[in-house]
A protein has these predicted regions:
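Transmembrane alpha-helix boundary and packing residues in multipass membrane permease domains
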Residues: 24, 103, 132-137, 146, ...
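Glycine-rich helix-loop "coupling/hinge" segments at transmembrane-helix boundaries
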Residues: 136-138, 150, 165-166, 214-257, ...
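Membrane-helix/interface signature in polytopic inner-membrane proteins
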Residues: 163-179, 185
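Generic hydrophobic transmembrane alpha-helix motif, especially the helices
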Residues: 62, 66, 72, 93-98, ...
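Alpha-helical transmembrane segments of multi-pass membrane proteins
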Residues: 24-28, 136-137, 150-156, 207, ...
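Short helix-capping/hinge motifs at transmembrane helix termini and TM-loop junctions
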Residues: 31-39, 106-110, 135-141, 153, ...
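Gly/Trp-centered helix-boundary motif
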Residues: 1-95, 99, 103, 110, ...
Length: 284
């Protein structure tokens, strides 16, 4: 077991991606214990205050303030809760739903497989952001509906990967032997199919997380995601777009955080695929 983990950690992409992701988890923790101010605190005398590298005399707000005089560092830390939190929660939900449906579809085949395929193909035919917008328009904006919308967007890709892996496993002799010995369908799916589908689930989960973060930010930027006063990073970008010429740091700092967070999960996905896919591992 230790040798497996050591081989995984030798992958540069995986190591760098995990390090970056750990940094954002640290930001989430710091938002509870080390945020200088509340994200709602307003300082009217310090509207659009410059960050420390532009104004050496201004040390009260390290990253400056927004147009209302709210501390950007505090809002950035609290915003990490929403961006990272929504990404994790929606990814977990999409794995639970799509993996279950994919295994059921791959095992039972027939009408069940056909029905689920038609549903997922219908969802996948709609561009991801447009699908998220449709869900938001139907259900309304807000935190819970944002989580639901990005979860639904992630379902088709996860479902197809798990279904393909389940179909491959179902064609193997040990599944047929288990059925001949009288093992129940639930036992076969839980004890045999699910463990052998974990590799594509792990790889795709990192991709689902980055897609969830990106879609959440896009919805927030359009004013349809997490609503004020909560400082989700996409919402912060939307609030700052009118001040990009006079206070560009209001957009560049949250935007750079989004870039690094998405980059970290993409690197994790690439590293996991390189190490867990036998074809790529043998080629390397």
């Amino acid at each position: 077991m230790k040798s497996k983990y050591s081989k995984l950690l030798k992958n540069r992409n995986l190591k760098f991606g995990l390090s970056l992701f750990a940094f954002f988890i640290l930001l989430v923790v710091l938002s509870f214990i080390a945020a200088p101010y509340s994200y709602q605190d307003v300082f009217p005398d310090f509207q659009l205050a410059a960050p420390f590298w532009k104004s050496a005399s201004q040390s009260q707000f390290l990253l400056g303030t927004d147009d209302l005089g709210r501390d950007l560092l505090s809002r950035l830390l609290v915003g990490a809760r929403f961006s990272v939190g929504i990404g994790i929660v929606s990814t977990v939900f999409s794995i639970m739903i799509a993996a279950s449906l994919g295994i059921v579809s791959g095992y039972y085949k027939g009408r069940v497989d056909k029905t689920l395929n038609q549903i997922m193909e219908s969802l996948q035919a709609i561009p991801s952001l447009l699908l998220a917008l449709i869900v938001i328009v139907v259900l309304g904006s807000g935190l819970l509906n944002t989580v639901l919308s990005v979860t639904i967007v992630a379902l088709p890709s996860m479902y197809r990967l798990v279904r393909s892996a389940a179909l491959v496993e179902c064609s193997k002799e040990y599944i047929q032997a288990s059925e001949a010995l009288g093992a129940s369908s639930l036992r076969i799916m839980a004890q045999h199919l699910l463990p052998n589908c974990l590799t594509p689930i792990l790889v795709q989960s990192a991709v689902c997380f980055s897609d969830a973060v990106l879609n959440t930010a896009a919805l927030g930027f359009l004013g349809l995601g997490v609503q004020a006063p909560y400082p989700e990073w996409g919402t912060m970008l939307s609030d700052a777009k009118n001040f990009i010429e006079v206070a560009p740091w209001l957009m560049t700092i949250p935007g750079f955080c989004l870039l690094l967070l998405i980059l970290s999960t993409q690197l994790i996905s690439d590293g996991l695929r390189d190490q867990l896919d036998p074809k790529l591992r043998n080629r390397a």
